[in-house]
Amino acid sequence: MTPADLADLLRATAAKVLAERGLDPAVLPDEVTVERPRNPEHGDYATNLAMKVAKKAGTNPRDLAGWLAEALGAADGITSAEVAGPGFLNIRLAAAAQGAVLEQVLAAGSGYGTADTLRGTKINLEFVSANPTGPIHLGGTRWASVGDALGRILAAQGADVTREYYFNDHGAQIDRFANSLVAAATGQPTPDDGYAGAYIGEIAEQIVAEHPEAPTLPADQRHELFRAEGVELMFAHIKRTLHEFGTDFDVYFNESTLFASGAVEQAVETLKASGDLYEKDGAWWIASSEYGDDQDRVVIKSDGNAAYIAGDIAYFQNKRSRGFDLCIYMLGADHHGYIGRLKAAAAAFGDDPATVEVLIGQMVNLVRDGQAVKMSKRAGTVVTLDDLVEAIGVDAARYALVRWSVNSSVDIDLNLWTSQKNENPVYYVQYAHARTASIGRNAAAFDYASVTPDLSQLTAEEEGELIRTIGEYPRVVASAASLREPHRVARYLEELAGAYHRFQTNSKLRVLPLGDDPVSPLNAARLVLVNATRQVLANGLALLGVSAPEQM
């Protein structure tokens, strides 16, 4: 019996109890909450349902809890239901009912934890979207991990997810990038507003190797050549780096196409005509302050040129034309103002601003031996995705970035994340999976196939804890999707790994027969428990884009 099964049973029982006493079952919530108590002595699960609905039903919370306890006590799979405090209900499950979740896990396999709650919802998930003027820095790296994990989690709930990278190949930063390449190719100092780092020289060398005449071309032609070739080479590097990191996109959208196609002008004229832009001081403005921005924003400047937000508005209109029900933007810590701007754009086009969600990620810092690591060997200024992967590897990098809420800044201790110790979270979780795989390999030497597992014998404290933790997984994935918080999956995996390590460390809980002893129904039941644990660990790691090693 999973927590969801118990919640359904509890609601059905409560509806019957209320109806039998002439009380209205309509006061019951659509979803009943059951939680695992912090103190195991309080049962396997607890609920405050009686306290939540008693007043609406016209009765006393303890009385209602007592009626529920009496009815639940007679239900299949329930060992006991006891009233506590002002109306809490503590519930214990029979071992066989509790163990049934293991069979569900093995039957579902990689599908355990998936759901259809977002079936039919078309989501555009835009993340990373780093400028093609240099390697991806740590902020973009965080989104490469978190965004990819969120896409996997939303898809696991049935959503149709389009992962999109907005390629900022239009604007002054591209001109500065081109000027930096020209300077490197012609032996000139880096411009004051240019980009430095070994990668600039490397790209310039590649361009000159392909176009030997490039340094001596007329200035305008030279600038355009280095601009076009440089952007193409830099973005090829970015795509390759992301792919090696395990993050790929369905759509790479070029900002420049919005201007070249006239989409920006068309979007602005549409909003002018609808009255959703207003004119002041010779410029055209959008009322983004009504949606959380600190001030309204200029869309068309007084000189007639488009402000940066004009491209954002046209880009949203493009997404809208592709039929997305929800657009999620994952932006850096310095982009808080974009929340109001993007929601204002949605409202201006007649959409519910709630169809736009903006997630803001805080800063990431690297630490080694207690000291901040601030310089990249290739970028020259900031630490990059390549630097992080070189230092700790892909799995550790992805996990380190995804296990924290994006609302908090992160310090990644390079010594910790390269250690093979339980204090290293990714090692702790992956080692748990490797241990389950090892038992599976060793079990192949015994005749488990002819023995029927008796899940009712899984009564040890460590076994019960592990089973209940396994049963929580679907709820964790669902909450990670609805709250847009992939770190919930990572923290859950650490909890599951801990429960498994405690189970296997107890030498009395043998999975494999001792010596020449035959496989017993209890041995077989414990192997089911191990295999179910292995499956859930693998499923959760897959959602995070982290490998599940068979041995370590």
Swiss-Prot record:
GO CC annotations, alphabetized: cytoplasm
Location in the cell: Cytoplasm
Keyword Aminoacyl-tRNA synthetase: yes
SUPFAM superfamilies membership: Anticodon-binding domain of a subclass of class I aminoacyl-tRNA synthetases, Arginyl-tRNA synthetase (ArgRS), N-terminal 'additional' domain, Nucleotidylyl transferase
Record EC number: 6.1.1.19
Main location as per UniProt: cytoplasm
Motif ('HIGH' region): 130-140
GO BP terms, alphabetized: arginyl-tRNA aminoacylation
Keywords, comma-separated and alphabetical: Aminoacyl-tRNA synthetase, ATP-binding, Cytoplasm, Ligase, Nucleotide-binding, Protein biosynthesis
Domain of life according to the entry: Bacteria
Reactions mediated catalytically: tRNA(Arg) + L-arginine + ATP = L-arginyl-tRNA(Arg) + AMP + diphosphate
GO molecular function: arginine-tRNA ligase activity; ATP binding
Subunit description: Monomer.
Recorded family membership: Belongs to the class-I aminoacyl-tRNA synthetase family.
PANTHER family xref list: ARGININE--TRNA LIGASE, CYTOPLASMIC, ARGINYL-TRNA SYNTHETASE
Descriptive protein name: Arginine--tRNA ligase
High-level lineage: Bacteria, Bacillati, Actinomycetota, Actinomycetes, Mycobacteriales
Gene giving rise to this polypeptide: argS
